[in-house]
Amino acid sequence: MPIPFHPLDLTDMASVRQRVKDTECRNCDLNFLNLFSWRFLYDTEIAIHNDHLLFRFKADGHRAYLAPVGESDWKDVVPDLLDDAARDGHPFLMLGVCEHSLKKLEETMPGYFYANADRRYTDYIYDRQSLATLAGKKLQPKRNFANRFTRLYPNHTYAPLTPEDIEECLELHATWTEAKGKEDDAGRYTYEAERKSLLRVMEHWNELDACGGVLRVNGQMVAFTYGAPVNHDTFDVCMEKADTNFEGAFAFINRSFVQSLPEKFIYINREEDLGIPGLRQSKISYHPSLLLHKYTVMTRHPMQG
């Protein structure tokens, strides 16, 4: 049966959040804020099909899918996804597949798929209490950074992020980008795409029901962050930027933002490291409680649907 995909837009938000909220899925790919703000890059489409939430998108020029969201029998949807790919002449490709979904695919069609893990897209998930307190010996270096920021910049303020902060956020993103450097075309592409995603979030801030924080020193924005829930107990931090000239700004805003979140969120997803060595080192240094591995799934006969 053909799947009624349509371009994802804001009218899909309630349906996505309702269907993901009560699952145990903590994958940042299913955060509606991410799906919406990066749609320009992936041409993301959505469908409700046989009581399952389905996503279709483009990645590096290839047609791809996310794993179905729905706990009932996947035999009602997986064959239709295979047919959808075959109908358009595309090899079947499913990205960001967690181990739970990988098991369901195998149960649905035993021996039909094979999967490869891609460490670049592993989600780093942390215990909320650890990030909110930075307590203990393992996190002492982070605690020291945050406390140093307090000592060095006594005139700092932390406040919720609002749509009125958009210009300052864009300026700080540009400052951060220059500090990181644009060493190659791939890096430049990434930064420019990220800026576009940021702009899209800020323009639709209230509709997206996003949550964020702003750190200032003497009235100057030196860091900002924002995110949105994935499910009932996991909050996804989608973006965090700081002026590296202000020592400890990253550690301080990380801690302050987590402290401000509702207590029902006991896990904090800080997303992937994309294979960037410095980013990987930074995420590991906060000692995640879970590494959510994700897989690329294809059929054993690529052109078979």
Question: Language-model segments: what does each one mean?
Answer:
Residues 164, 168-220:
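Short, conserved active-site entrance elements at the starts or edges of catalytic domains
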Residues 28-101, 216-244:
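Conserved donor-binding loop and adjoining core beta-sheet/short helix segment
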Residues 1-56, 303-305:
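Non-cleavable N-terminal signal-anchor transmembrane helices
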Residues 110-188:
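Acyltransferase donor/substrate-recognition loop-hinge adjacent to the catalytic core
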Residues 93-94, 159, 267-270:
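Short catalytic-loop micro-motif centered on adjacent basic/acidic residues
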Residues 101-116, 144, 274-291:
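Conserved active-site alpha-helix within GNAT-family acetyltransferase domains
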Residues 16, 149, 283:
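A residue-level signal for conserved active-site and pocket-lining positions in enzyme catalytic cores
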Residues 209-300:
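Aromatic (often tryptophan-rich) hydrophobic motifs at membrane interfaces
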